């Protein structure tokens, strides 16, 4: 019998715990991060209306990256999501790291979004 829980199951439990307390509004939407082994995705979500206001990922055609699974790609995604948020008039967000550790690609995306003008 396998008793060890997977890393993703533990991440999902952490994410659910945080999401019970954290919610995005129209005035201050939620910046959600999802990372896979090959790509990273960022969405700005209004949870009250259930609408995605802006998004960016390493799969975007606007983003010209050679490697999609490293911190430099995450930095470019952070800059792009902040630019798209600014176009929609969004400056303040709540950061939702998605149960991931604030380290590596997640930290690179957050720092780039902050430098590009998002406040959190």
Curated annotation (Swiss-Prot):
Single GO molecular function: structural constituent of ribosome
Q: Name one GO biological process term.
A: translation
Kindly state which keywords UniProt assigns to this record, in alphabetical order.
Answer: Chaperone, Ribonucleoprotein, Ribosomal protein, RNA-binding, rRNA processing, rRNA-binding
Cited InterPro entries = Ribosomal_uL18_bac-type (IPR004389), Ribosomal_uL18_bac/euk (IPR005484)
Name the CDD domains on file: Ribosomal_L18_L5e
UniProt KW Chaperone keyword: yes
GO cellular component annotations of the record: cytosolic large ribosomal subunit
SUPFAM superfamilies, per this entry?
Translational machinery components
Q: What does this protein do?
A: This is one of the proteins that bind and probably mediate the attachment of the 5S RNA into the large ribosomal subunit, where it forms part of the central protuberance. Required for correct processing of both the 5' and 3' ends of 5S rRNA precursor, which is does in conjunction with ribonuclease M5 (RNase M5, rnmV). Possibly folds the 5S rRNA precursor into the correct conformation, thus acting as a chaperone.
Q: Which NCBIfam families match?
A: L18_bact (TIGR00060)
Query: Quaternary state and partners of this protein?
Result: Part of the 50S ribosomal subunit. Part of the 5S rRNA/L5/L18/L25 subcomplex. Contacts the 23S rRNA and 5S rRNA. Required for catalysis of RNase M5.
Q: Which family does it belong to?
A: Belongs to the universal ribosomal protein uL18 family.
User: This chain belongs to which protein, by name?
Assistant: Large ribosomal subunit protein uL18
Q: Which organism is it from?
A: Bacillus subtilis (strain 168)
Taxonomy, top ranks, is: Bacteria, Bacillati, Bacillota, Bacilli, Bacillales
